[in-house]
Structures are given as C-alpha cells and as structure tokens.
Amino acid sequence: MARRSVLYFILLNALINKGQACFCDHYAWTQWTSCSKTCNSGTQSRHRQIVVDKYYQENFCEQICSKQETRECNWQRCPINCLLGDFGPWSDCDPCIEKQSKVRSVLRPSQFGGQPCTAPLVAFQPCIPSKLCKIEEADCKNKFRCDSGRCIARKLECNGENDCGDNSDERDCGRTKAVCTRKYNPIPSVQLMGNGFHFLAGEPRGEVLDNSFTGGICKTVKSSRTSNPYRVPANLENVGFEVQTAEDDLKTDFYKDLTSLGHNENQQGSFSSQGGSSFSVPIFYSSKRSENINHNSAFKQAIQASHKKDSSFIRIHKVMKVLNFTTKAKDLHLSDVFLKALNHLPLEYNSALYSRIFDDFGTHYFTSGSLGGVYDLLYQFSSEELKNSGLTEEEAKHCVRIETKKRVLFAKKTKVEHRCTTNKLSEKHEGSFIQGAEKSISLIRGGRSEYGAALAWEKGSSGLEEKTFSEWLESVKENPAVIDFELAPIVDLVRNIPCAVTKRNNLRKALQEYAAKFDPCQCAPCPNNGRPTLSGTECLCVCQSGTYGENCEKQSPDYKSNAVDGQWGCWSSWSTCDATYKRSRTRECNNPAPQRGGKRCEGEKRQEEDCTFSIMENNGQPCINDDEEMKEVDLPEIEADSGCPQPVPPENGFIRNEKQLYLVGEDVEISCLTGFETVGYQYFRCLPDGTWRQGDVECQRTECIKPVVQEVLTITPFQRLYRIGESIELTCPKGFVVAGPSRYTCQGNSWTPPISNSLTCEKDTLTKLKGHCQLGQKQSGSECICMSPEEDCSHHSEDLCVFDTDSNDYFTSPACKFLAEKCLNNQQLHFLHIGSCQDGRQLEWGLERTRLSSNSTKKESCGYDTCYDWEKCSASTSKCVCLLPPQCFKGGNQLYCVKMGSSTSEKTLNICEVGTIRCANRKMEILHPGKCLA
C-alpha cells in the first residue's frame, strides 16, 4: 500500500511539472464569515470561489489549492459589568449626629472591560433620634480637663504651650512657667510621622497622632544641616538626622512578570484583621521594609502596560534618608480631629459610621520609619527582545544599574562595560540598554513633584540634564515622604478614651467587613493563570510570564503550560457559636479549582474566632472602659481541702449546675447546646480523691440552625432548625435568580455546600438573552439562534438534574448550559427535575420516565422539560403535569403487559395508562412490551 502511494505521488508530481502549476489566487476568497462568538474565542471561515474551468482541470488546481480556511477570532473575554446590590434598610437614627445611614455592597466587580460602578455605596440622611446621645465623658480624676474633654497632666497648665489643642489650659493664668529656656522650632515635616496609613490603598491618610504636643518635656535633637536644635514631640521615642546618598546603594531587581511582585516572600504584604481575615496584596518596597501601592495609579499603569505584550520588568531604586524616627509604644497623644471622631462614634455598632474612620484616617499608623525620598523606576522590556539580546537576567540588571549611574546620577568614575553597549538590544538604540525598554513606570516618592517628574524616563528622550537629580535630591530635604516604615493597626490607638473596649471591638468588626471589600476572591478567574487583583470596583488581571493581552488571554510562542492554578473563593458566613464560645467559617479552593496539574491554594481553609456576647442586649451596647475589661476566667480560683474542680464538658455541651467547686458525692449534669442531643450517661460524680467518675458522653449534632442570608432571598421551608438530611431552597423575586447554588443540605455540623454571606439575587440572564425566542435561544438582530454553552452561560443559572443517554448516567447541570446544548440538537440529554440530583422518589421517577419516553408518540416542549403521552403542559408553571388514567386515549400501538399491585392477573395497557399509574407512584410491574398473551 505504501509503495502504491509513493508511485501515485511521483506520477502526480510528474504530471504537475509537465503542465503549468496552478495559480490558486486566480480563484478569489469570499469574505470572512462573522465570528461564531462575540467574545471568549470563536472561529470564522472563508471559502475559495472555485470555477471548474479548463485552467482548473489542466493545472491540477483541485489537488493544489486549499478550498477553505479557518481562523480564531474574538478571543477576548466577555465583559463583566459591575453590579451593585440594593440598599439595605436605614439604620437607627444616631442621636449624636442626628443622621442615619443605609449601605449596599458590590455584588460583582467589573472585569474584562465591563462597566464600572460609580454610584456611592453608603447614603446618609438627617433624622430625628428617639434616644438620647450617649457620649460618655472621660473621667479625668486628678488630671486637668480641657474644654474639648481631653485629659492632660496638671503640670501642663500655664506653661505657655497649647497642650490642650484648644488653649484652655493656658486660660486665666497669672504667671506662666516656660518648659524650655528658649524657643525651638518643630522638626520639619514632623506632622507626616503622625498621619494614618491606608494599607489597602497604599497611601497616607488623616492625622492620628498630634506631633505638635511636647508633653511638658524639653527634649531636642540637632541636625548637621542647621545650628539650631529642633524640639522633639512627646509621641516620638527617637529621632536621628542623616543624609544618605551613597552611589553603591543603587539596587536593581528583575521580574519575569508582575505576579512575582505580590508573591515573592521577601516582598509580600498581607492584610489581617481580628478574626483572621487575611489576603496577600502586591507591594513595592523601598529597602528593608514594605510600602504597599497595590491600588494606586502606578501599579495599575504597570498592569496595563504588561497587557500590551509579553513583558519582563527591571526595577531600579535608591533610598535617600533625611531622618529616622521611632514612635513610642504606649501613652500616645492622639490628634484632636482623630480623638473627636472616636468620641462621636456610637456605642451601637454601625458599619457605615465605623468604616468612615478607615476612609478618613487609614487602617494603620507609623511605629517607625524615615523621612526622605526614593528614586524608583520600573522599566518594562519585551521578553522576546531581552531573550534575543543574549544577556542573562543578572547582566541585564547590571546594565540598567551602570547606565543609571552614568546618565542619571552622573557618577564620574562609572565605566560602562562592553557587553552593555554591544548586545543586540543596545545596538538598536545607539549603545543604550535603557532606551531599549518599552516604557518606565515612575514610583518616585518625596521631593517636589516637578523635579520628580523630570527624573522619569520616556522612550526616545535624549536623557537628563546633569543637575536634574541633584535638584530633586535637594528638594527631598524640604519635601520628604515617609519611607521605610513599619506599621501597627490603628485600632491599637483606641485606648484611654470613654468606652474604649466597646469601640475597639466595634472597630475590629468594621475592619473585617471593610477589608473584605478589597479581597480579589470576588473576581472571576483570569485566563492563562493570570492573578486577579481588585482595584476599587474593577478587577484587573496580572499576567504570568509568557502571557499578555487585556485580560492575559494571549500567549507567547514558547508558552506551553495548560495547567490551571487554584485560587480561593470568598469566605462563607460565620457559623453559630459552639460550646467553647467560638465560631468558624470556611472557604473553598474553587475560583478556579486546580486543573491539569495546577497548584493548590496556599493558606488556611478554615478560620476560628472567639464569640462576643452582650449581657445587656435589650438595653443597648454597654460602655466598657479599659479598666473594666474582666472575664470570669480572670477571677481567682477557689482553693479547698476537699471536693472537685469544675469538669470539662464535652464539645458543644455545658454543665447545667455550673459552679467553681463541687462537694464529694455531688453530681453535675451535662446538657447540650441547641441543635445537639446527649448520647451516653450525662451525669458526672465527684470522688473523694478530687477526680470525676464519668462515662462516655457526647453531644451529637441533630440539627442545623437557619442560615443568615440577605433579605432579598427567600428560604423554603422556613423554620428555625433543620434536622440532618433536610434541605432548603433559596429563591428570588420574579425576574431574578440566585447568584450561586440554590439548594443546600444540612450535613454534619454545617450546610453543604457552604452558604456564602455575599450570596444574593441577580437579573435572570436567561430571560434577558432569549428576548422573544424559545428557551435555549437568543435574539440576534431579528433572528433567533441557539445560545453558546461557553459564551452565553458563564453566569450562574439554577441547577437541573439531567440524564445523559450516551453515558447512561445522571448529573447536575446549569440550566443555561442544558438548554443551549438541547437547542444545538444534543438529543441525548433528558431533563429529570429542577435542583441538584438527590437520591429519592423524584430521581427514581425521573429515570423511569426517561426510559419510558423513548416509545412516546408525543413530545411537546414545556419549559425545561418535554411532555409525553401521559402528560400535559401547564401554561401557568411551564411544567409537565400527569394525566389521570381515564383521561388517556384508548388503544394505540405502544402496548404493555403489566401486573397491578399484588394481583396475579395480567392486563394490557397503553403507554399513556402505564405512565399515569407510575406517575401516581402506584405499584405496577411491566412484564413485557406488547399485548398479554393470555
């Protein structure tokens, strides 16, 4: 056979050579067809317009010319528009500010070029309070009370300094006693050290520490630049002036992609709050310590630049310090504006009011750092051009560092090495390696803005003037920024004010909710293992090395991996409190799940925290001060010569007759929390040796508590407790569907699958897409075409239980995908019932009905379903409803021989009668198809 093929080829080749080769372009191509998809990668084709004429036949055009071409099109991801939830109810009227608020959340951030959300998430309105304003005044005891309510030491009265901030401590003074023998100026820019810092936004916010307060102490520090010392504020432990400009501290770093900026161990910042909610954020650093700029324009600019081509980045940075500082560990003097904001917070938790603290003052404060500036540029290079240059990563970093020393710092002794000017990339740009970069992103901080802007590099520019860097360096001394800093949570500053413990607890709760708004778990997975990051209400994709495009959808020629790394989904809502007064929550590695050898998610799957209870729940939140925070466990233990200490109850259990010490022979009774029942002997007896005689006893869960869901969702059936094995269904108002699974089952100690606290309703995309078309179709101009399972079904739709006749198996499928495939003539799929596949009568009848349907003469579409001979379609519910046996037609070709109930006699029934009897769940045995023989 092989020899015959070779001979045929030789003969064909000889004939072609003998004749004239076909000029295929003689037959023009048609226009490319429209793309099969508008997004998410489709295909289009074109055909050659063949005319079988003499030329075509004589020149073997049939064998030579391709008649059809296909290409990929519209590979960009479908845009996801930002979706805001509805406003919740108005909060109670705050009696102190006479305002109330309502809040809504971002249900879905925008992504892949979708429309962003611009409307506010919080609304305020004036109101008439029904309660008195409960702003507690500080108990100054032996201290002086300022008009503002602040307490200061008595020794600070009449010292000629405004220690109160409102000058009330210097009023009605006969004589004043100066603290210092002469007047000293404050440290330049000392107020910057007292600003708050928003860790999630990566920028300083309002003043939280009053660094004009000196505390009646005359402590000074001297700078080498001036002869006059500066006064040191009371909040600072140490201050040291220095000017650091050494040339050899110029650092360079190489990044194959921007994801390594966020995942490198030495450069990773993580945000955490009380309760353990944490996630990593990409950061840029100055030297040893971290500075987060995740959400500012520089990082966004870098991401957008990386989308245009497969890129690598070289970062060069140099730190110039003017002074170093360390903040005191305790007894810090808060700024008036921050103190006033804290004092006006209500005792009752109000998410909107408490979250404003973080908007205005940030999430952290500076515990140490430096004032100065940072020369910092991030150069973007084409990965392909860097590879073709012949330089290694270390050599490329070295060339950027050497050229920066020569062309920016104008270091006199810098020698440019031969390899940095003669490689293939530098040769294209007159010996300059930096000129081969695509662009640079400026991360310069400190100094006057016009000098900082002049240091930024632009492609094609002639270079910097020699004085540019020195001018910026001088301006850093007058206009420094806080750099190389360390942070502590701003919540730690809430001490020694009225109701400090109550407000600290409320702020921790608010910070946990506030931080969740920045968690990229809300984003859809990015193509090619891109890492999503949330910027405001927009999700951006940070591309892996070897990928690029607006959403990382394009691959460089040498990118071969098809693995999908796992990413965390969002946390579930907190569970109810157990017997140890703790609650927990979980998350799943499913956004996306690891596929084709991809990495598993790093981090914890489950978190646990202590529960808090209000002992005055009906009287509002109590005011607890710092010196009043005591728990029962802090009470001294009672020592006795005989008896037994309190025993440890089983998990999810408690002691009914609880006390600290029990007499010999005394019994304790073990009871279980709601939703649990006692299994075993529930009495312990105190023995003379101080131990307990106890049998095996445990609290086994028997019920799940009704989950907490958003108001727009309806729970069916609605009850307080559900036994193990019971299920609930979540539904939405007409025109909306649940934006996630709708069915949940009580299993073990939780609901399965976990119920997300962000679960809500969204517009029914199926209804919107189909327009005036049938289910499974969408409107395209004036025509109805089948929906694409991949393109049109990326949104959530309700679950259906479906049977596949090819695999002879049933499975749960999204409704949209089922309808789209059914429209595309996928006849092997059969609807069983709404909801996920669960063992039981509904599934059994669905499978039996599918087997019986193969012989049905009637097949009428009805919603998701198809009605058969023994059914009719209900117009009101779009569901198939079984007929009664007398409503069936008589006779017919599809007959069966059956036995009814416990009867031994045989009976012939048609397919309609068989279907109605089995639908009513009456006992019947089908003996064989056709009439009974007897």
Swiss-Prot record:
Residues 1-21 form the signal peptide. It holds the Pfam family Kazal_C6. It is a multi-pass membrane protein. Glycans are attached at residues 29, 32, 38, 90, 324, 392, 568, 571, 574, 855. Residues 138-175 form the LDL-receptor class A domain. Residues 858-934 are annotated as: Factor I module (FIM) 2. Component of the membrane attack complex (MAC), composed of complement C5b, C6, C7, C8A, C8B, C8G and multiple copies of the pore-forming subunit C9. This is Complement component C6. It comes from Homo sapiens (Human). The gene is C6.
